[in-house]
Amino acid sequence: MSPVASTRWCPTPEQLMILEEMYRSGIRTPNAVQIQQITAHLAFYGRIEGKNVFYWFQNHKARDRQKLRKKLAKQLHQQQHQLQLQLQQIKPKPISSMISQPVNKNIIDHHNPYHHHHHNHHHNHHRPYDHMSFDCCSHPSPMCLPHQGTGVGEAPSKVMNEYYCTKSGAEEILMQKSITGPNSSYGRDWMMMMDMGPRPSYPSSSSSPISCCNMMMSSPKIPLKTLELFPISSINSKQDSTKL
């Protein structure tokens, strides 16, 4: 019994070189006519059938797809690795270190107008009279020093002493103005400044009024005295007369 001949195709080097050249030229899936022509041409270099040509092109396309898939996977892996390196370089600081750092209030006030406004409003809320500290020094307005008191024998007409400090030439004039009327709501006793003492001299070139506050701050301290406009003895005599 003769041995069965092997049906496995063993291409020769010339056949493989011709097939690879055809594949590089652009032939990927040859039709039936092309397969017959290629088989007839390769039969000069060895045994070959039409199915061998068909399967060679199919296997060669599969190998190329596998190589392309591996190449794309490798490129994707490299891109992910580079992205991780970039993220590590720009990694933000931990939250604990940011909390431990002191906050500069001046920077916050400069960059946040709302915080600046709120801070000023809060500051003015606790000190509402700071803006009135030097009003008398900035304007030549009258200055009153009342001392309200309550007691028996309060006069029906109230007296308000207003002091004006003006300047005419090189001399200063202290004027006192008395205002009476039912609309005034002051008490019976008033704090008055006595013995004003020597007042400082100013150059005669300026003709604008100078406030009392500036003059008082530049002059030595002046003692204050309380005058009894309504002595107690007169009040007692009035009470005795009413009893009679």
Swiss-Prot record:
Q: Output this protein's name.
A: WUSCHEL-related homeobox 3
Question: In Gene Ontology terms, what is one molecular function of this protein?
Answer: DNA-binding transcription factor activity
The protein's location, in the record's own words, is:
Nucleus
The gene name on file is: WOX3
Q: Which domain of life is it from?
A: Eukaryota
Under the heading CDD domains, the entry gives: homeodomain
List the SMART domains hit by this protein, alphabetically.
Answer: HOX (SM00389)
Q: What is the lineage of its organism?
A: Eukaryota, Viridiplantae, Streptophyta, Embryophyta, Tracheophyta
Question: Record's Gene Ontology CC terms?
Answer: nucleus
- Species assigned in the record: Arabidopsis thaliana (Mouse-ear cress)
Which protein family is named in the record? Belongs to the WUS homeobox family.
